[in-house]
Amino acid sequence: MLFGLYVLLTFLTLVLAAAVSRSGGRQLWFSLLVLGWIVSQLNTLLEAVVFSVMPWTHAAIQLAISLVVLALLAALAVLVVGRWRRRSVEPPPLDKSLGTLGLIILAYEALYWTAGTFVWPFVADFYADRPLPPVLAVIALQVPRSLIFVAAAWPWLRTSPRFAPFVLGFAFAMIGGIAPLLPD
């Protein structure tokens, strides 16, 4: 039952992201697929594998299955908002400077540790009998994870979405944070 809620929340988030996009067709479908799959699966499972919470073989199977599911959900989201036949838009220029990437990394580190403080009471039982990784290892892993999140958002940002900061923040929180925390 809760898996169904997880899928529904993910789908509704993709519908929102599709609805505010000015693009359509395969460009929009691909951007939703990348956003949904990387945020909900790849970047989360990376941490699980690196810190030995899940073996790589299990993560690979989950990644493959979720790629198919999210491809279908992204296509359905584009269809629901009536954008499958809409032409792609010319993407706006995006700031790719090292300074911007540095600020993204710092902001992600701050958000990661802040969110972790709030989430800890809900996940502490899961980690009760597992050794926690060294803090410096966790900090170091967040650098590539922050850049992976940038890569996840990049194709969608290229669709010229309206309200991008709010929708992207909501999408990251919902499909990367809230929905995965639903109990099995």
What is each stretch, according to the model?
Residues 1-184:
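Juxtamembrane/disordered regions of integral membrane proteins
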